[in-house]
Amino acid sequence: IVEMSVAGGNYGYALMWVIVVAVAMRYVFVSLIAKYQLCNPHGEGVLDGLSRLHWLYAPFLMVSAIVMGHVYESYVTVGIGEAFVNLFGRGTVWGWAALWNGVALAIVFRPVYGHVERVFKGLLVLLTLSFLGTALWVGPSPSGIFRGTLAFALPDQVGQFSPLLITIGMLGAIGGSLLNLVYPYFLEDKGWTQPKHRRVQTYDFLLAMVVMIVLDLSVWTLGAELLHAQGLQIATMDDLPRLLSEVLGRAGRTLFYVGIFAVLFTSVVGFAMGLARMASHGLLRWRAGS
């Protein structure tokens, strides 16, 4: 959401081609990972297959999962704190962050987490529908989207964030990152472990891709039409709620922060569980001699 907001708000539709490349990268990477996980003749996971190619993959991915797990959790933690400070206007970033990390730790291994997760998913659906409805109300520019999709060029820098930085951020966040290698563990959680599950996995992944694309394009449109068209820019986190508050008023600002909190809180749990499993898998494979 942040990447799309800044891209649309600061550069209009000029970087639209980046999201096309990023989505294509994500589809290729995740599809290859899922196909190997479900259909390889050895009945092994992706990390196991990489470890058979070279023994260093196991310790490398173990260390990478630990390091990047701390990096991911750090910025998500800060995001939670900033969301609550901006929403309520009181407290400190680290105070709120510590509180909600404590809540996550307390409930993640208890049956109650499933119910909490469903509530947050409901909030995410509400946020997505709000972005989509507001974007349709504002109205995207088909010609601007078309030109931006075919541009394949970086515009001059506007504001604090260079177009190259935004491009790298989108390619990493959407296209390819270490988190793609966590996907097989969530397939196992769903019980999808055999070639016969390939079809349902593909449908599930395509649905997730469609939802992601709709959300990204909605946020991008709001940034381009509400902010960029008026010469406004996104410089701080408190500029982001204007994507909804320009149309929905104060309720839009509140909805934005509540939705962002839902995204970040579920990410705290998801990153911790997924990357921890990758790290432990890498350790076990390394100790077994790959």
What kind of region is each of these model predictions?
Residues Y27-C39, L187, V210-D239:
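Extracellular/periplasmic helix-exit of transmembrane alpha-helices
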Residues V18-L50, F60-Y72:
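Juxtamembrane transmembrane-helix boundary signature
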Residues C39, Y57-G89, L264-L283:
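Hydrophobic transmembrane alpha-helices that form the core helical bundles
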Residues V125-Q157, L164-Y185:
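Hydrophobic alpha-helical segments and their helix-loop junctions in multi-pass secondary transporters
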Residues M62-V63, L87-F109, V125-L136, R287-S290:
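Transmembrane alpha-helical segments of multi-pass small-molecule transport proteins
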